[in-house]
Amino acid sequence: MRLLHVVTLVSDDGIFGGPPSVAVAQSAELAARGHDVTLMALWRGSGPAPDRIGSVRLRSRPARALLPGRGCIGLLHPLLVRDLWRAMGGADVVHVHAGRDLVSLAALAVAAVRRVPCVAQTHGMVEPRTALPVRLFDLLYLPLLRRARACCVLTGHERRLVARVLGPDGPPLRILPNGIRPGPPEPEPRRPRDPHVVFLARLHPRKRPEAFVEMARLVHQEMPEARFTLYGPDDGSLPAVRRLIDEGPAGVVRYGGALDPAEAHEAYRSAAVHVLASVNEPFGMTVIEALAAGTPVVCTDTCGIADELARRGAALVTDGSPQGMAAAVRRLLGDPELCARMARAGRRVVEDVYSIGAVADRLEEIYRGGGRDERTGGGGTDHAAREADGRPGQEPATPSPAP
């Protein structure tokens, strides 16, 4: 098949979060299976856009802020619309990694006008919102999203939220977890790693980097040899993080800036523990990346895949408080055998549930119009589906156009 994937923004600092890495991983696996795949996006970086990301062909335009002050959702380039029109003329299926943003709106509109089969994937970015700018945007956006052949969601919880947004006239909602290609296993027996704990995410209030710094302070009180690093682009929380670091003991916590994918992989591989402090995380792609690198994970009980990981012994799940996360980190740093067991369990869960091969199998089925209709009902393994359904004020994976 000739496939066109569209994602809002690809950048060298990862500011748009998980959707670009998911789009690249899916595109690479589909291309390896013989499909003709192109990825189209805006580009923001210190240099010109690459022609390829790994094995994936990239067509891009420089990101321009058409709606100033709206972050990634207000980005577009006028010529990207022309590029979309031309590219869809030869596509069998268009896969839009869709948020409430101008690029997604343009891609869905062009697919509708050109009558190209379209699959949307919302990545936790389309949730019920009542703010006036969102309601105005949705007057254009939702009718286009309802025309998709299918809409892919991460978990049962996200399926219920998207169903509330789209209503009874929405497309079939298909659960599609994120996937990753596991790296080579570590030699046995697993060698203990230095007591280095990492945070890899945007520095955004929902990601709770300040809670990570507070957790680090508590761990350091009992384990003074431990060191902590936050990696990721600033999305509003860096000033508060720097202030907390400066107020704490010198040399214990540092901010390492944004990482490219290769640097992030090395950060996972060298860390003793990865901590995802986020609340109401729709999925938690960094968790899967850490597990694939053989790194034990601590996460909160509102992470979308927390129950699955806990059931398989692949993560320590906490209540999200700095005290709870600190206790979990101390437990891992003090027990090399537990770390080794969790590393093995993490690799198994990636291979069994979150492999990119299984995701591509599912995508091929969806592209061909098959698969089980999942418009309604429960399912999924997410704790958030039970505890947070309908909770007001939840944040999507990337900023939405709310004031």
Predicted regions and their residues:
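Glycosyltransferase donor-sugar binding loop
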Residues: L200, R227-V241, G257
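Aromatic "clamp/platform" in nucleotide-sugar-dependent glycosyltransferases that forms part
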Residues: V279
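Conserved acidic donor-binding segment of nucleotide-sugar-dependent glycosyltransferases
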Residues: R311, A315-Q323, R331-P336
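Nucleotide-activated donor-binding/catalytic signature segment of Leloir-type glycosyltransferases, i.e.
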Residues: P239-A262
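Conserved donor-binding/catalytic core segment of Leloir-type glycosyltransferases
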Residues: L4, E188-R217, T229
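Short hydrophobic beta-strand element within catalytic cores of glycosyltransferases
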Residues: P296-T300
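Short alpha-helical donor nucleotide-sugar binding micro-motif in glycosyltransferases
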Residues: M88, A258, E266-A271
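Carbohydrate-associated surface elements
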Residues: H157, G179
